[in-house]
Amino acid sequence: AAVRASPDLLGSRGEDTASDGSVVWAKPYTFRAPPTPGQNSLQRIIVFGDMGKAERDGSNEFANYQPGSLNTTDRLIEDLDNYDIVFHIGDMPYANGYLSQWDQFTAQVAPISAKKPYMVASGNHERDWPNTGGFFDVKDSGGECGVPAETMYYYPAENRANFWYKVDYGMFRFCVGDSEHDWREGTPQYKFIEECLSTVDRKHQPWLIFTAHRVLGYSSNSWYADQGSFEEPEGRESLQKLWQRYRVDIAYFGHVHNYERTCPLYQSQCVNADKTHYSGTMNGTIFVVAGGGGSHLSSYTTAIPKWSIFRDHDYGFTKLTAFNHSSLLFEYMKSSDGKVYDSFTIHRDYRDVLSCVHDSCFPTTLAS
C-alpha cells in the first residue's frame, strides 16, 4: 500500500492507496493519524463485542445466529464522522473454521475499518480448541486457533500468538487482555497486565481502560449467576487487586450478549451511590458488559445484584468521549435507533486518581 500523509502534527489527514507503485488496485481511503499520548483534544472511542456478520437477504446464514449484526454495522457507518477509533473486543465473525465467513465479515466492516483504526481482542470463537495452549479446552473456534484473527488484523503485541497488548490513544490507555490464555497471577499475561496498568502517567493519560472478551469482572448473566460468582470461573480473583491498585476507570467485557453497567466497585461493594455522575477521589472501577454487538441475546438472572446499575437485553454499543484531561462521557446506544439509553460522566483532576484510598498506595517508611 502506498501511504501519503501530511508532514504536520499527528492528527492530520492522510491517504492510503493499495497499489504496486504503478497500478492502483482499489480506491484511495483517507484516514486521520492518531493523537499522541497525552494530547489534549476531543477523542471518541467505540467499544463493543460479539457482533458477527449477516447478509441482507439471509441467504448464507445458519439459524440467523447474529441478527443484530447489520444494525450495529449500519449505525457505525452512518456515524463515521462522530468517532475516532473502534475496539471490537472479541467474537468477530463467528466463522468457526469457515474462512469464507472471515471474507464476509471483513467486507461488512470495511467501510469502518478503511477509515478508522479497528482494534480487536481475542474471543472464544477466534481462539479456543483443545490441546492448543489456550486456557479453555473447548471447540468454539472450529479449529482456527486464533490464526485468521492474527492474520486479518494488526495489533501491537510483542508475540502475536499472545493476544494481549496496550494502546496509547491520546488521553487514553487501553490494556487489552486475552481471556483465552491464562491471566492468573504468576503467568506472563498477568505480568503484562500489571506492567500496562502501572506504567501509565495519569497526569497525561488519565483515562485507564482494561478490556478482555470473557467476563473477568461482573455480569448478572443467568449462567454466571447459576455458578454463584457472577463472573468467568477464576475471572477476577487475581486481576481485581490490579484494577484496584492502579485505579482502572472502566473494565470492559463481551462474551455475554447483552449490556450491563455496574456502580464503581471495590471488593465487590459499591463505593459511590450516584448512578450518573462521578467526581472527586477515584475509589472504584466501573465494569461494563458490551457484548450486544449482534449475536443472539443472553438472558439475565431474575434477581438484580446491588452492584448492577443498568441492564439492557438488546443490541447496542458504547462510546467514550474524552473532552479533556478531567472530563469523560460514557454512552450506551441501541443499534436499532442510535439513541442513548444509558450514560454517565466522570469529572476529576489527576490528583484525585493519585489520592490514597483502600490499598491503592504501596506501604512506605520514613526512609522512603
From Swiss-Prot:
The keyword Transcription does not apply. It holds the Pfam family Metallophos_C. Monomer and homomer. Belongs to the metallophosphoesterase superfamily. It is found in: Plastid, Chloroplast. PANTHER family: PURPLE ACID PHOSPHATASE, PURPLE ACID PHOSPHATASE-RELATED. Hydrolyzes pyrophosphate, phosphodiester and phosphosulfate linkages of nucleotide-sugars, sulfonucleotides and nucleoside di and triphosphates. Highest activity observed with the substrates ADP-glucose and adenosine 5'-phosphosulfate. InterPro entries: Calcineurin-like_PHP_ApaH (IPR004843), Metallo-depent_PP-like (IPR029052), MPP_PAP (IPR041792), Purple_acid_PPase_C_dom (IPR025733). Keywords: Chloroplast, Glycoprotein, Hydrolase, Plastid. One of its GO terms (molecular function) is hydrolase activity. It comes from the Eukaryota. GO terms for cellular component: chloroplast. The keyword S-adenosyl-L-methionine does not apply. Glycosylated. It is an enzyme of class 3 (hydrolase). This is Nucleotide pyrophosphatase/phosphodiesterase. Its EC number is 3.-.-.-.
